[in-house]
Amino acid sequence: MCTAATYKTKDFYFGRTLDYEFSYGDEVTVTPRNFCFRFRHMSEVKTHYAMIGMAYVADDYPPYYDAVNEKGLGMAGLNFVGNAKYQDVQAGRENVAQFEFIPWILSQCATVLEARKVLEKMNLVGTPYSEKLPCASLHWMIADKDAAIVVECVEDGLHVYDNPVGVLTNNPPFPVQMFMLNNYMHVSPSQPENHFAKELPLATYSRGMGGLGLPGDLSSASRFAKVAFTKLHAISGESEAESVSQFFHILGSVEQQRGCCEVEPGKYEITIYTSCVNADKGIYYYTTYENHQIQAVDMHRENLDGDTLRRYPLVNEEQIRVVN
């Protein structure tokens, strides 16, 4: 289970939580422009846009969970179990394996509009990375500073949806998530007025009562509504520190604590990491469950004309600043 969001102040930000019961050994990974992408069904790509994101690098290949390229286009894959249905290889189409989807788009597209054009020719197939890394059931959000879309490959084919809220979680399918926001049209950051009955002297007794009815559980539909509301009402200054801090607060509204989401006896889903990328500057910020101090990797401090992945293991030890 995961949550992705966009946010815009002076710069454009893109990020997500990754919620699961264990980690594969994720690393912040920079793919430079001349790293050779060898695709399973398409020709290799030797020169492309550089990108930075979170990946589990296997056999010197970065299957990204989320990433942003040097042009400011971001993309994240989130669990879509039970609904994701990939296609068989088709002649005359650009056949892309599910685990290649993020590199395929970010290597060649600078904007959401360009990504839409690539998607028109693409066939998303269920080729697994390996026997040890089977196909993941995912859907994706792709976003730049001007637009966001959701891509879902289901039983009847590939669907692309405009995403006016810039948020994605998991099930149900995106159109249903958007429809269910109708349930919360009464929710407001302002204090409510008495519409129950004018003859009753009803009054607020606490701050925040305009938010009554906003869900607080950890289900994907509830997280979608909670983050959409939080993001659309969040106010931030335009500095980098203020913007990044506010982005982490937005996604912090749906963090999962160990013990609150049991997936099987004795195993619990937690927010393994939360990311926030300044897509304009190529800086990848993150926190982990064990370490709340924000870490940062700047892709532009790397040799982006190189041909070798740059990998940064996550800093997982809690950083506590003692002030006396």
Residue ranges and their predicted role:
Residues G92-P128, E240-F248:
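Proteins synthesized as precursors that undergo proteolytic processing into mature forms
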Residues K121-H159:
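Catalytic cofactor-binding cores of redox enzymes
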Residues V68, I149-C153, S275:
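Broad, structure-driven detector of short, well-ordered beta-strand segments within folded domains
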Residues M1-Y13, T127-S130, C135-A136, K145-A147, ...:
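C-terminus-biased signal that marks the final domain/tail of proteins
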Residues G15, A76-G77, E152, Y161, ...:
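Beta-strand residues in well-ordered beta-sheet regions across diverse protein folds
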